[in-house]
């Protein structure tokens, strides 16, 4: 029996994310992972939104209300699209990403403050079938620290899960809309 299209799409997303992140080290690894999560959240939110009438929709551009990674996380949580442990993991990654992006030095995932944030969320993600399947493959990759391996596993698991969830969504359909005149 062949896997269903959703499983294949999630597997392809996971592979792409893992390959992208394994090509990076240090700051690049964290920034690429967080950027990929930001994009996955945008896909999830757009999947439940009515399409924009404006072909040049700027709702998700950096200077707009949903332009930040944090705003996307919060909205996805408030809409019930992600559960609390996923929200916590995304915020932990956001905090690490912010530290890496604004550090003048050479930050590493081994630093205690980053480990403290991430160690809170790893136990929730580790039982994921995707994490379990990818962990041995990453362990065989030379040059990656244990912290980098765990971070890649977390981000890959999250991106694949969020993208798969986005594929299952349909646009929100309100029972009524606000109008100036009744129809």
Where are these regions (language model features)?
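Amphipathic alpha-helical interface elements
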Residues: 1-183
């Amino acid at each position: 029996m062949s896997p269903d299209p959703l499983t294949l799409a999630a597997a392809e997303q996971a592979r792409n994310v893992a390959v992208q992140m394994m090509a990076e080290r240090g700051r690049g690894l964290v920034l690429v992972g967080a950027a990929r999560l930001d994009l996955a959240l945008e896909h999830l939110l757009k999947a439940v939104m009515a399409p924009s009438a404006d072909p040049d929709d700027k709702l998700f551009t950096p200077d707009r209300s949903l332009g930040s990674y944090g705003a996307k996380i919060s909205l996805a949580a408030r809409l019930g699209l992600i559960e609390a442990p996923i929200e916590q993991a995304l915020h932990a990654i956001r905090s690490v990403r912010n530290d890496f992006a604004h550090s003048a030095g050479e930050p590493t995932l081994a630093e205690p403050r980053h480990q403290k944030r991430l160690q809170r969320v790893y136990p929730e993600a580790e039982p994921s079938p995707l994490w379990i399947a990818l962990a041995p493959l990453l362990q065989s990759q030379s040059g990656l620290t244990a912290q980098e391996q765990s971070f890649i596993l977390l981000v890959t698991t999250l991106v694949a899960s969020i993208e798969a969830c986005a594929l299952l969504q349909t646009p929100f359909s309100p029972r009524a809309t606000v109008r100036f005149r009744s129809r």
